[in-house]
């Protein structure tokens, strides 16, 4: 069972809880979602609790993360977008931490679960809709009407824009889920090659060198992907929030 590359993604109950026929069990996914949030909050707290004029390593990382997301928001949604800084920064840190924790052996990668990434995507799109209608009323619907479109093409373009908007939570969630899933499966397969060949003795050890090199290279690549996927999620969030702040601006 452990040789199955998809076994690492199975949801397993830790504390079974059932109320009124509804399963509220505490699972490995629940544990590592809580762990991801706790690690992110804990790191930021300890990194900034003893702030110094000349920052140490942890304070530098925390400040760089803050400035990174702040600049991203200003570029993607303008200065008004800074009101959403807590949301975007929290999402970025959670996704990044969850991705990185999933790189450790026997740890669970919560971002490889479509239900988790879809919930995050729904949070983003829900925020866009709620703020858009709250701030602009029905003028928010201008987001579906690009400027400069000939009247004869307007119905078709509006239909395309609506479909594109409705597909955003799907594309946002599937992109993160698929990349993390595929990367971890590939790592598991190459690591399995190394273990299987190594068990054959001296001849197998020689043949395991190439898969081992590939595994090390893929591990390094997966750490890069872990950051890039958090970055892409945050960038797209900023772009979608820009539609809520400036509807009809495209």
Curated annotation (Swiss-Prot):
It is a multi-pass membrane protein. It is found in: Cell inner membrane. GO terms for cellular component: plasma membrane; proton-transporting ATP synthase complex. InterPro entries: ATP_synth_F0_asu, ATP_synth_F0_asu_AS, ATP_synth_F0_asu_bact/mt, F0_ATP_A_sf. Keywords: ATP synthesis, Cell inner membrane, Cell membrane, CF(0), Hydrogen ion transport, Ion transport, Membrane, Transmembrane, Transmembrane helix, Transport. The chain crosses the membrane at residues 29-49, 84-104, 114-134, 143-163, 193-213, 216-236. Pfam families: ATP-synt_A. GO terms for molecular function: proton-transporting ATP synthase activity, rotational mechanism. The keyword Transferase does not apply. Coiled coil: none annotated. The keyword Iron-sulfur does not apply. Belongs to the ATPase A chain family. Key component of the proton channel; it plays a direct role in the translocation of protons across the membrane. F-type ATPases have 2 components, CF(1) - the catalytic core - and CF(0) - the membrane proton channel. CF(1) has five subunits: alpha(3), beta(3), gamma(1), delta(1), epsilon(1). CF(0) has three main subunits: a(1), b(2) and c(9-12). The alpha and beta chains form an alternating ring which encloses part of the gamma chain. CF(1) is attached to CF(0) by a central stalk formed by the gamma and epsilon chains, while a peripheral stalk is formed by the delta and b chains. This is ATP synthase subunit a. The lineage of its organism: Bacteria, Pseudomonadati, Pseudomonadota, Alphaproteobacteria, Hyphomicrobiales.
């Amino acid at each position: 069972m452990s040789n199955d590359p998809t076994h690492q993604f199975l949801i397993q109950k830790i504390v079974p809880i059932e109320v009124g026929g509804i399963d509220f069990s505490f699972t490995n996914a629940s544990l590592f979602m809580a762990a991801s949030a706790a690690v992110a909050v804990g790191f930021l707290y300890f990194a900034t609790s003893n702030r110094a004029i000349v920052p140490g390593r942890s304070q530098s990382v925390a400040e760089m993360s803050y400035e990174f997301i702040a600049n991203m928001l200003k570029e993607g949604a303008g200065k008004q977008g800074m009101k959403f800084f807590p949301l975007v920064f929290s999402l970025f840190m959670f996704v990044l931490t969850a991705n990185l924790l999933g790189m450790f052996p026997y740890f669970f990668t919560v971002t490889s679960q479509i239900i988790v990434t879809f919930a995050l995507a729904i949070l983003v799109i829900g925020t866009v809709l709620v703020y858009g209608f709250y701030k602009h009323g029905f003028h928010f619907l201008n987001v579906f009407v690009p400027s400069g479109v000939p009247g004869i093409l307007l119905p078709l373009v509006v239909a395309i824009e609506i479909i594109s908007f409705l597909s955003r939570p799907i594309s946002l969630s599937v992109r993160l889920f698929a990349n993390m899933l595929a990367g971890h499966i590939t790592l598991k397969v190459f690591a399995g090659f190394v273990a299987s060949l190594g068990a054959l003795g001296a001849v197998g050890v020689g043949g395991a060198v190439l898969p081992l090199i590939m595994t090390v290279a893929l591990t390094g690549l997966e750490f890069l992907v872990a950051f890039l996927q958090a970055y892409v999620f945050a960038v797209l969030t900023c772009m979608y929030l820009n539609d809520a702040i400036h509807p009809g601006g495209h």
